[in-house]
C-alpha cells in the first residue's frame, strides 16, 4: 500500500487533514487508525457521553503515573481509539480559545499562528448555528449549536453570574469570550458531530482517500527522510509507503510515543530504550500540559434537575426516544450554560472555566446524593505545571509513561482555592435562593486553605485536555519539535499536526483548536498561501486592570 500522504490517526486534526488534503482530487491520502467504527448509540447519542470514555473498545485507557501532589493517585487520561479519535468520546463542548492564547503561541515561536492568523481557519471549519455574525463561519463541515436551554437551573446560573457583577456574553466563540452565557456543542440533528462525522466520512467517499485499521508501530526513516509507516494488523507487520509525506496526528500521548519509537526524541532516553537515534530532539514528550477540574455540587430543593432521569428505566426511556426521533434529553450533552472568568485584576483574558450541569453526579455517572441537585465543573485553565511523556519500553504496544506533575506550581493551589470560594459566591446569589440546598461537595465544613487543599488533593481530576508534547516553535529553539509549518525539525517528509504541537495550552476545551490545527496544517502541507489574516479585534474587558469582573 502507498499514498501521497499517510496520516497516522483519524482524530480531530487527522480527520480535518484527510478532508483538506484530498479536496482537489489530485493527491492520494491514506489514514491509519488503531481503533474501529463509531457506529452505535454509545458514541452518537450526545447524552450517552459518559459511556464511550469508559469502554476499552473506544478508549486507549491510559492512566498517569502516581501524582505526588494528588495523594499519589493515578489520574485517568482517556484518548479516543476509534474513528474521530477523542472527538468521538469527548463532552462535545466547543471552545475556540481566547485570542491571547494564539498571540502567546506566536510569542513562543509559532510564527504565523497568532489570533489574526488562525481566526480565518476557525471560520472556514465552522457551520455555526446562531453565533455572532461576522465572527463565525456558516458553511464549514463542523456544525456548532446551542442546547435547548429549557431547564430553569441554567437560567439561574447565568443570572447568578450577573448578580455577582460578572459580564455576560452572547457568543463566547465570537468577539467576547469573557462572561456567563450559553455553551456551544458539536451536535447536529441530535447526533454527536465528531470530526469523523464532519470530515472523515465525507472524505472517505472520495476515490483518492482510503483507510487502514491497524496499529502504527513506527515511522520508517531512510537517509533522513520519512518514507512510510510500519503498521501491524491481523497479527502481521507491513509497511505503508508515503510518496510525499507522513503526518502524525495520533494525540498528545501517542504522537510523541511514535516519534520516539522511530528514533526521534531525547537522545539519552532513546539510547536507554535501545532505539537508534535518528534525530536528537529533547522536546519530544516534554512540555506536557493539561487542564484540571473538580465538581462543585449543591442539593436542589426543587425537583427540577435531571435526577429523575438517572434510574436505568428512565435512561432507557430517554434512549428509546432518541433512537426513534433523535430528540429529547438524549439529543443534548446537557452542558448548556457556562462561564469564562478572570481570577484577578490585571489579567487580559479569562483563566477560570465553568461547565454548569443541572444534576449532581459523580465521575462514574451515579447520583452524588439521594436528591435533586446541580453542579459546576470548575477549573483553572492556565496552569504553569508541566509534565512529560516517555517510553515504558521499545514495544509499540506498551503504554507510554505519563507524568503530568499536576499542581507542582504554587500558583495552581492559589487559583484553585479561589475557584472554590468564587463558586460559593456565585451559588450564594439570590438567583439560586429558590433552588439552593446543602452543599454536597466540597462540603460546608471545607473552609480554610488547608481544608480546601486536602479536598483538592483527593478530588481534582483531569479535564482531558492534554497538549504540548511535540511543541511548535522556531527552528533554533532546542525544545521545539516542529517548525511553524508543522515540519519535524531534523527529518524531511514528516510532520506532526494535533494538540501535541500547541506551544501553550489554550483556554478552553481542545477539540476546536485541534481541528483548526489540522485545517491550517493542510494548507502548509499543500504549499498554499495561508488564508488572509483577520483585522478583527476581540473584546478585552475595559476594567481588566482594576477588577476581576
Curated annotation (Swiss-Prot):
Superkingdom of the organism of origin: Bacteria
Pathway assignment: Amine and polyamine biosynthesis; betaine biosynthesis via choline pathway; betaine aldehyde from choline (cytochrome c reductase route): step 1/1
An MF annotation (GO) of this entry: flavin adenine dinucleotide binding
Catalytic reaction list: choline + A = betaine aldehyde + AH2; betaine aldehyde + NAD(+) + H2O = glycine betaine + NADH + 2 H(+)
Binding site for FAD: 4-33
GO biological process per UniProt: glycine betaine biosynthetic process from choline
InterPro entries, per the entry: BetA (IPR011533), FAD/NAD-bd_sf (IPR036188), GMC_OxRdtase (IPR012132), GMC_OxRdtase_N (IPR000172), GMC_OxRtase_C (IPR007867)
A cellular component term, taken from the record's GO annotations: membrane
Cofactor(s) needed by this chain: FAD
PROSITE patterns: GMC_OXRED_1 (PS00623), GMC_OXRED_2 (PS00624)
Entry keyword set: FAD, Flavoprotein, NAD, Oxidoreductase
Residues annotated as the enzyme's active site: 465
EC numbers on record: 1.1.99.1, 1.2.1.8
Record HAMAP family: Choline_dehydrogen
Family the UniProt entry places it in: Belongs to the GMC oxidoreductase family.
Stated role: Involved in the biosynthesis of the osmoprotectant glycine betaine. Catalyzes the oxidation of choline to betaine aldehyde and betaine aldehyde to glycine betaine at the same rate.
Entry protein name: Oxygen-dependent choline dehydrogenase
Amino acid at each position: 500500500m502507498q499514498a501521497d500522504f499517510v496520516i497516522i490517526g483519524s482524530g480531530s486534526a487527522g480527520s480535518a487533514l484527510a478532508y483538506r488534503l484530498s479536496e482537489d482530487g489530485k493527491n492520494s491520502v491514506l489514514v491509519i487508525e488503531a481503533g474501529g467504527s463509531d457506529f452505535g448509540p454509545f458514541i452518537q447519542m450526545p447524552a450517552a457521553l459518559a459511556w464511550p470514555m469508559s469502554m476499552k473498545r473506544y478508549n486507549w485507557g491510559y492512566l498517569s503515573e502516581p501524582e505526588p501532589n494528588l495523594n499519589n493517585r493515578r489520574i485517568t487520561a482517556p484518548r479516543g481509539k476509534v474513528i474521530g479519535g477523542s472527538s468521538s468520546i469527548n463532552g462535545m463542548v466547543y471552545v475556540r480559545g481566547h485570542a491571547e492564547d494564539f498571540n502567546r503561541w506566536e510569542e513562543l515561536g509559532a510564527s504565523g499562528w497568532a489570533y489574526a492568523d488562525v481566526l480565518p481557519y476557525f471560520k472556514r471549519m465552522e457551520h455555526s448555528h446562531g453565533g455572532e455574525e461576522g465572527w463565525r463561519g456558516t458553511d464549514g463541515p463542523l456544525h456548532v449549536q446551542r442546547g435547548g436551554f429549557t431547564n430553569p437551573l441554567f437560567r439561574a446560573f447565568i443570572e447568578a453570574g450577573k448578580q455577582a457583577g460578572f459580564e455576560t456574553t452572547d457568543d463566547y466563540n465570537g468577539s467576547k469570550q469573557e462572561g456567563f452565557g450559553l455553551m456551544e456543542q458539536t451536535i447536529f440533528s441530535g447526533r454527536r458531530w465528531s470530526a469523523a462525522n464532519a470530515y472523515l466520512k465525507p472524505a472517505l467517499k472520495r476515490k483518492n482517500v482510503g483507510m487502514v485499521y491497524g496499529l502504527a508501530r513506527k515511522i520508517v526513516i531512510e537517509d533522513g527522510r520519512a518514507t512510510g509507516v510500519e503498521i501491524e494488523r491481523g497479527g502481521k507487520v507491513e509497511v505503508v509507503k508515503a510518496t510525499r509525506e507522513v503526518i502524525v496526528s495520533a494525540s498528545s500521548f501517542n504522537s510523541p510515543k511514535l516519534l520516539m519509537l522511530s528514533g526521534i526524541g531525547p537522545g539519552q532516553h532513546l539510547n536507554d530504550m535501545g532505539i537508534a537515534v535518528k534525530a536528537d530532539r529533547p522536546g519530544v514528550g516534554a512540555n506536557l500540559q493539561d487542564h484540571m477540574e473538580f465538581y462543585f455540587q449543591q442539593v436542589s430543593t426543587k425537583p427540577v434537575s435531571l435526577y429523575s432521569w438517572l434510574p436505568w428505566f428512565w435512561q432507557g426511556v430517554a434512549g428509546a426516544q432518541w433512537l426513534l426521533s433523535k430528540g429529547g434529553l438524549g439529543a443534548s450533552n446537557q452542558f448548556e450554560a457556562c462561564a469564562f472568568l478572570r481570577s484577578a485584576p490585571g489579567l487580559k483574558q479569562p483563566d477560570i472555566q465553568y461547565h454548569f450541569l443541572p444534576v449532581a453526579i459523580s465521575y462514574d455517572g451515579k447520583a452524588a446524593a439521594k436528591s435533586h441537585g446541580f453542579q459546576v465543573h470548575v477549573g483553572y485553565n492556565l496552569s504553569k505545571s508541566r509534565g512529560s511523556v516517555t517510553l515504558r519500553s521499545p514495544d509499540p504496544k506498551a503504554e507510554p509513561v505519563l507524568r503530568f506533575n499536576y499542581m507542582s506550581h504554587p500558583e495552581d493551589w492559589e487559583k484553585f482555592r479561589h475557584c472554590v470560594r468564587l463558586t460559593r459566591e456565585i451559588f450564594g446569589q439570590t438567583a439560586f435562593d429558590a433552588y439552593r440546598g446543602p452543599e454536597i461537595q466540597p462540603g460546608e465544613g471545607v473552609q480554610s486553605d488547608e481544608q480546601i487543599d486536602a479536598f483538592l488533593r483527593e478530588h481534582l481530576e483531569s479535564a482531558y485536555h492534554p497538549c504540548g508534547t511535540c511543541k511548535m516553535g522556531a527552528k533554533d529553539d532546542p525544545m521545539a519539535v516542529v517548525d511553524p509549518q508543522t515540519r519535524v525539525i531534523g527529518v524531511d517528509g514528516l510532520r506532526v499536526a494535533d494538540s501535541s504541537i500547541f506551544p501553550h495550552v489554550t483556554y478552553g476545551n481542545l477539540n476546536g483548536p485541534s481541528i483548526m490545527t489540522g485545517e491550517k496544517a493542510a494548507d502548509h502541507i499543500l504549499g498554499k498561501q495561508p488564508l488572509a489574516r483577520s483585522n478583527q479585534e476581540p473584546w478585552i474587558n475595559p476594567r481588566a486592570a482594576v477588577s476581576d469582573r
